[in-house]
Amino acid sequence: MITDAQFHMYLPDTSEHPWPRDPDRSKPPAKHARSFTPEEMLGAMEAIGVDRAVIVPPGWAGEDNSRALAAAAQYAGKFAVMGRIDPYDPATPERLEHWLEQPSMLGIRMSGKWPATPTQVQDAFSDPALEWYWAACERLGIPLMMLTRQFASRLLPIAERHPDLTLIIDHLSTQEGATAAEAFAAFDDMIALARFPRVVVKVGNGPSRSRQPYPFEDVHRYLRGVYDAFGAPRMLWEADITQLTKNTYAECLRLWQEDLSFLTAEDKDWIFHRATAEALNWPE
């Protein structure tokens, strides 16, 4: 079985499901403007042999998870959801208590910059006001996908204080860069988190940070470094399909299937499926 640990649904801004009007996210970036539906994702998955995928609602669309959950219900067994919630909303403490009771809801996706009205928080991961939030998610067993970009080091205090909280580092903690080295500027900070057993990494978007054609050899050393530090049972494959501009969905999968010689068959089973199933408590 192959599980894709992240894709974004891009659906229209409608009166029934409006996007928030905060200045930082009132509309998506231009490259995201076209629709990407669950049906399109199913077609892409079928074409390369991916069995199921995790829907991660995009940040600029707000905290309305209803359409993602509806897609998971419509295509049962194919999709589940890592939803969004505003940690600064006064209603959030009560909502967290029942978060995982929502059918197909697996956890929460967090951004470090939180463009919430009336206060825009530039570094939510380091905000002392959210200590209650990390503690609640730890107590309730809610996994958190953390969009750290180049700020992996900001997870260190959270991991130290909350050893039973599952923290999933998104996209190898990379950022856009002119070179692979620039994109992986936070690599050492990410590796430093490997000592915490509940910290895992989404690894599949390495090709998007490469500046070479397939098989993207300029990022292989980083992928090997993650493998050596975290091990396959803490590596989750994903392609982030809506972000692909220089490579294809098939190439993102093929790289891990064929071109990383250090991976064993058991490693691939973990990376393609079992690690996501365990980290997100999403059994077959």
Predicted regions mapped to residue ranges:
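Mid-to-C-terminal alpha-helical segments outside catalytic/metal-binding sites
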Residues: 1-3, 14-15, 20-52, 224-225, ...
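Histidine-centered catalytic micro-motifs
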Residues: 2-12, 169-172
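Conserved, mostly hydrophobic/aromatic
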Residues: 6, 45, 68, 99, ...
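Active-site environment of divalent metal-dependent phosphoester hydrolases
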Residues: 10-13, 60-63, 88-91, 115-117, ...
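Short, acidic/polar
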Residues: 34-44, 89-100, 185-186
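Active-site gating/metal-coordination segments in enzymes
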Residues: 51-52, 61-150, 157, 200-206
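Catalytic pocket-lining loop regions of alpha/beta-barrel enzymes
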Residues: 122-236, 284
